[in-house]
């Protein structure tokens, strides 16, 4: 079967080189016209060879082919979004009219997805709900998760049983000089990072993954799901903690050291007390 990757929220194309290595066809969906021009310029050869398609549109769950309001961030293009920003920060955005397409319509045009990456600045849950409602289940799926809503939707649906986590802030350092299809590859800053079995660690079952999320929290983190891979049942709490970022590991080590010091102080005090008593 043809491997098709849907990059929903392509930005300036940081993920595309990796996705081209992992698929037969990449569908890059990006609302910002200037960023789409950058993608078209940088990947002209792949577009000409039929390996890459650029959809310059807002991806929505609404009726197809309608111009809609979109909010371009004036300083940081990665923060541009479809939903209206909070009034307190609205002046940081430029409101423009851009073409839109329904996510299901896009998939019907290009074919069954092998992997879908969703990174749409506060619109992620809308797209995820629509995919699950329409029974669109790619073998691999990732969604940026700033709250518990994403994992709740996935678990309530019940289709995906295997999970991994990618911390966006760690991607450039953690996934540097990796062998991808016999090519030495490093993921750039702002890249979504790897998917599938290119992510470090074993796949987790639900209860272990929820424990991991309780340790590391939400934010700039992508939840990855798989229909292809069975989860490991033998993750222990310390393994899960070491799966996560170094700050958490250091925090846990400090706590362990603290309690060890308390323990040895107590033992020494008790021993001295016994000596003075007898």
Stretches found by the model and what they are:
Residues 57, 101, 118:
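Cofactor-binding loops of NAD(P)H-dependent oxidoreductases
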Residues 44-46, 70-75, 134-135, 158:
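Short, hinge-like loop/turn segments at secondary-structure boundaries
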Residues 1-65, 145-147:
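SAM cofactor-binding core of SAM-dependent methyltransferases
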Residues 3-4, 18, 22-25, 104-254, ...:
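Conserved acidic-Pro-Pro-aromatic motif
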Residues 33, 76, 101, 121-122:
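Alpha-helix N-cap/helix-start capping motif
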Residues 60-101, 105, 110, 183-186, ...:
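Glycine-rich adenosyl-binding loop in Rossmann-like folds that engage adenosine-containing cofactors
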Residues 46-53, 93-94, 112, 137:
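A short helix-to-beta-strand connector/capping loop
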């Amino acid at each position: 079967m043809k491997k098709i990757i849907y990059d929903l929220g392509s930005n300036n194309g940081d993920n595309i080189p990796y996705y081209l290595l992992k698929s037969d066809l990449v569908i890059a969906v990006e609302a910002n016209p200037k960023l789409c021009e950058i993608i078209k310029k940088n990947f002209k050869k792949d577009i000409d060879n039929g390996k890459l398609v650029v959809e310059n549109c807002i991806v929505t769950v609404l009726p197809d082919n309608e111009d809609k309001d979109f909010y371009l961030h004036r300083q940081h293009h990665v923060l541009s979004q479809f939903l209206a920003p909070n009034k307190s920060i609205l002046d940081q955005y430029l409101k423009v009219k851009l073409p839109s397409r329904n996510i299901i319509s896009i998939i019907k045009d290009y074919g069954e997805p092998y992997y879908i990456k969703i990174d749409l600045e506060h619109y992620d849950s809308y797209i995820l709900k629509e995919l699950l409602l329409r029974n669109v289940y790619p073998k691999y799926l990732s969604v940026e998760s700033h709250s518990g809503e994403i994992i709740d939707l996935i678990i309530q649906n019940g289709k995906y049983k295997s999970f991994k986590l990618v911390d966006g802030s760690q991607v450039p350092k953690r996934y540097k000089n990796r062998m991808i299809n016999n090519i030495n590859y490093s993921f750039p800053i702002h890249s979504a990072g790897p998917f599938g079995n290119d992510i470090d660690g074993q796949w987790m079952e639900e209860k272990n993954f929820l424990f991991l999320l309780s340790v590391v929290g939400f934010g700039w983190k992508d939840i990855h799901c798989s229909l292809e891979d069975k989860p490991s049942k033998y993750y222990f709490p310390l393994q899960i903690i070491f799966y996560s970022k170094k700050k958490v590991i250091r925090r846990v080590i400090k706590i362990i050291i603290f309690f060890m010091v308390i323990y040895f102080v107590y033992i020494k005090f008790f021993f001295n007390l016994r000596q003075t008593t007898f």
